């Protein structure tokens, strides 16, 4: 599946990635690292997501929904460190990354086989994820149990439409 994704999305850089195994990494802002950790359901804590990739994908979707796009200025180097694109691909988020890029730019060229287009799509995804994490920080401030608060947020979103 990984090889098919790279061939489909990045045919000209496909062999470069496979040859050097230098897959791009999705960066997380240093000031959001603690929030991302707390959203992870590790040993039945306050989180409800299985992986960091799930947290970031949800945050990116939330960022798009609320039109919040914020650049990652300082990258977290500790837990969670930047996440390999391979993790997102294995979880099925490659389409989400491409969809967000196309919707954001309103230009199908972002799906081209050029390496710059792939980097642009990843950058857009990171920025929306950071914006979504900012929104989550505001919404979850003071919450003891993130699961209950996230359910309330999702229900409010559902009924507000």
List the predicted regions and their residue ranges.
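Charged, low-complexity intrinsically disordered terminal regions and linker tails
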Residues: 2-42, 57, 69-161
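Short, basic amphipathic alpha-helical segments that act as recognition/interaction helices
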Residues: 48-74
């Amino acid at each position: 599946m990984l090889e098919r994704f790279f061939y489909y999305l990045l045919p000209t850089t496909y062999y470069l990635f496979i040859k050097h195994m230098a897959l791009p990494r999705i960066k997380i802002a240093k000031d959001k690292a603690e929030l991302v950790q707390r959203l992870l359901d590790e040993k039945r804590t306050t989180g409800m997501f299985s992986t960091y990739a799930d947290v970031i994908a949800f945050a990116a979707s939330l960022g798009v929904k609320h039109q919040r796009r914020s650049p990652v200025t300082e990258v977290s180097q500790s837990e969670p460190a930047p996440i390999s694109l391979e993790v997102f691909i294995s979880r099925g988020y490659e389409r989400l990354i491409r969809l967000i890029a196309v919707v954001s730019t309103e230009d199908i060229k972002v799906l081209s086989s050029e390496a710059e287009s792939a980097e642009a799509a990843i950058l857009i995804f990171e920025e929306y994820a950071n914006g979504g994490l900012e929104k989550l920080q505001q919404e979850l401030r003071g919450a003891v149990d993130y699961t209950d608060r996230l359910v309330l947020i999702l229900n409010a979103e559902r009924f507000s439409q």
